[in-house]
């Protein structure tokens, strides 16, 4: 059954919040993105009637780059908006709501990209700020070849069952005006490329981009930074850019020295990278893959299979790596499974020292397969995937199941030393230790019920403990005495034959 459970790192919880990212067509102005976000907010309330308490939208980039460093967001330009949807009921099934919104919004707003990020704090931490648990990175010196290869991977990844919101974080077709100055024309009128760039920057972004100008207030002695720029309403067309005056480094009051940008440079519309990410100095592209309706381990296996099959199409000197929460899940599973096996081995060795026997500890740990079977059935029947909390619960179950089994075997040893009948000793041990074993197991099972029936991330732990301990208790009371009787009846018979 363990192979049919599926694998997750940590289960998703019902937080009552949906975090959504909207990306309008590249180059959309900030005011248009804001109006579009308002329309989308209204559509969300229509798609989820009576389920929305409030929607907060945040469009565009912050004024300073320092604020962006502390906000885990895929926003790269004015066309991006982050929408935080607060639900009326904190226990609402956010995964079902995401499915409804993803389908409905895509149909209503073609050309706009919608992705969903984890809303609970644990998933955000495990993703290291990334918007998805799987981050496939293409890193290499040839940026354009890497981008085309990343697009091929995206097409393959979108066919994976359970893979949703498969997007490339970096864009390569952001609408941009390219101003290419003509050195020959510029030198003919005593203008350089620096003169063109300085005047264009001063007109569009302000004088502080070229040179900082301070004014000293003689009355207070305080200095004020003065920023001079052309009002944005006057720079609203290509013609207004072509008529930007370009002065020379040599000041002259003559009118014939005034030159326009359109006479000295060519303006053309092109598509350029919206954001450039570097890894080890080389350009890097992030392919984000989210998971919906399937376990993370299954989707990761398919992603790794496709990535391996596409190795021969990889650009020269490029590297393909998988990061994010999914890569950490492998290490966590290996460590927890090793810890589970190490716990069983250490418990066995400790019992060997205590009982001064290799056989009795083996009989004691025969209850542990029942615990594993109970864990598998409990997770399977409750539709709970295997996760780190579930494996932690398995380790807890091993200790309690072993302690109960020790009670039965230790009493059976006492009885067999008195009358020498292994079968009778096993029966007496099962009857006498029935109440203590049942009380110990019941206390832990009932104590885990609130956790198992809740919506926290530790719910798989409680379910694993309840299922594992329930079956392990049956094994302890019925199977372990049978194994003890079977093993020791043969030993007692051989000892009697040797004595005779």
Where are the predicted features?
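Transmembrane helices with small-residue packing motifs
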Residues: 1-28, 66, 70, 92, ...
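Interfacial helix-loop-helix hairpins and adjacent transmembrane helices
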Residues: 1, 26-38, 457, 482-500
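Flexible hinge/switch segments at interdomain interfaces of large molecular machines
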Residues: 9-17, 74-80, 115-133, 137, ...
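Signature of alpha-helical transmembrane segments and their immediate interfacial
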Residues: 1-11, 53, 107-108, 112, ...
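Hydrophobic transmembrane alpha-helices and their membrane-interface caps
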Residues: 349-433, 438-457, 463, 467, ...
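Extracytoplasmic/periplasmic membrane-proximal domains and adjacent transmembrane bundles
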Residues: 147-150, 154-343, 347, 352-355, ...
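Solvent-exposed, membrane-proximal periplasmic/extracellular interface segments of envelope transport
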Residues: 32-128, 133, 155, 184-210, ...
């Amino acid at each position: 059954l363990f192979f049919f459970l599926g694998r997750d790192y940590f289960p998703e919880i019902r937080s009552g919040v949906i975090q959504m990212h909207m990306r309008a067509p590249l180059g959309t102005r900030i005011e248009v993105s804001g109006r579009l976000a308002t329309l989308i907010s209204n559509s969300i309330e229509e798609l989820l009637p009576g389920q929305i308490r409030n929607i907060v939208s945040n469009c565009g980039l912050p004024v300073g780059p320092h604020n962006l460093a502390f906000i885990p967001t895929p926003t790269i330009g004015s066309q991006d908006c982050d929408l935080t949807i607060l639900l009326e009921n904190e226990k609402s099934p956010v995964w079902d709501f995401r499915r409804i919104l993803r389908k409905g919004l895509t149909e209503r707003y073609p050309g706009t990209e919608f992705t969903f990020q984890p809303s609970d704090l644990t998933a955000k931490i495990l993703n290291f700020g990334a918007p998805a648990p799987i981050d496939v990175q293409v890193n290499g010196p040839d940026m354009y070849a890497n981008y085309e290869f990343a697009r091929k991977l995206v097409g393959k990844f979108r066919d994976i069952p359970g893979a949703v919101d498969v997007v490339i974080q970096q864009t390569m077709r952001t609408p941009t005006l390219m101003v290419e100055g003509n050195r020959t024309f510029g030198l003919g009128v005593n203008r350089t490329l620096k003169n063109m760039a300085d005047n264009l920057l001063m007109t569009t972004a302000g004088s502080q981009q070229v040179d900082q100008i301070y004014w000293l207030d003689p009355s207070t002695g305080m200095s004020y930074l003065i920023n001079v720029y052309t009002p944005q309403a006057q720079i609203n067309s290509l013609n207004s850019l072509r008529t930007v005056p370009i002065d020379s480094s040599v000041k002259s009051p003559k009118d014939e020295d005034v030159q326009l940008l359109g006479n000295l440079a060519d303006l053309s519309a092109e598509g350029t990278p919206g954001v450039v990410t570097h890894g080890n100095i080389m350009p890097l592209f992030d392919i984000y893959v989210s998971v919906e309706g399937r376990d993370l381990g299954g989707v990761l296996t398919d992603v790794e299979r496709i990535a391996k099959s596409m190795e021969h199409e990889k650009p020269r000197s490029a590297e393909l790596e998988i990061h994010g929460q999914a890569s950490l899940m492998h290490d966590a599973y290996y460590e927890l499974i090793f810890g589970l096996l190490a716990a069983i081995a250490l418990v066995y060795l400790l019992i060997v020292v205590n009982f001064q026997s290799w056989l009795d500890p083996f009989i004691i740990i025969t209850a542990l397969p029942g615990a594993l079977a109970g864990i598998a059935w409990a997770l399977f029947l409750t539709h709970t995937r295997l996760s780190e909390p579930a494996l932690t619960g398995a380790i807890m179950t091993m200790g309690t199941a072993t302690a109960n089994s020790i009670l039965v075997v230790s009493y059976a040893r006492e009885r067999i030393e008195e009358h020498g009948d292994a079968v009778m000793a096993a029966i007496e041990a099962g009857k006498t230790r029935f109440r203590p074993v049942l009380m110990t197991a019941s206390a832990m099972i009932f104590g885990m019920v609130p956790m198992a029936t809740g919506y926290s991330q530790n719910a798989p732990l409680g379910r694993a403990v309840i299922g594992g301990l329930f079956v392990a208790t049956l094994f302890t009371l019925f199977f372990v005495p049978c194994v003890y009787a079977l093993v020791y009846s043969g030993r007692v018979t051989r000892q009697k034959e040797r004595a005779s």
